[in-house]
Amino acid sequence: MRLKAGKLRMWIQMFEHINNPQRVLPTLKRKNENGHRVYYDEDKNRYHSVTTVVGTIDQKGLDEWREKVGKDVADYVAIRSGITGTKLHKIVESYLANEKSEEENIFAKAHFNNIEPLLANIDLINGLETKLCSKRLGLAGTVDCIAQYKGVDSIIDFKTSSKKKKDEWIKKYFLQTTAYSIMWEELTGIKVTQIVILITGEDGSREEYIRNRDDYVEELEEVIAKYTEQ
């Protein structure tokens, strides 16, 4: 069964947020340098984009796919997926912030309606679309959600897909959220080891992955080292 857009379901305020006045996160500015996304903090420290770094682990497969389907098709799919993903994130952010969304993109609305049942597992939200960085890792990025998921403090990321994923296809998502977990701990002193990936597929699939970040720290460090050696 494929996704159907329909109308965005109306919602009322239901998510509780945690306000911590002692928590001060750095101000990060994003730039593009030589085709690569980087971040700078207030002290001019430079950080690689976590998305860019972990994306290198499946670059070979992506290049092979682009060659197979052709540049025009690959560019179209990438652009459409990027737009849909961005708009879905805005809808989800509004929803979790107890605000109404006016988004009209039919693909994003369909994905939201598909993933909404999983969002009911979220509570006690500590941050939405929060910019983080780690001097230890040399990485920075924006985490979708920091909250409890099924009663456990978690780093949560939302993803769109054309179809149901296999575990081996989404290793970079686990590495990405592991990086966010380390960043959050470094900046706040709060250790959050549960990482959660929620994926909505165009084929109507809805996937929930719950992992422990400690299972991915070593591999993340290896990927970072390989990237910085280039």
Over which residues does each language-model region extend?
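Metal-dependent nuclease catalytic cores that hydrolyze phosphodiester bonds in DNA/RNA
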Residues: L3-A140
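Mg2+/Mn2+-dependent nuclease catalytic core
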Residues: T130-E229
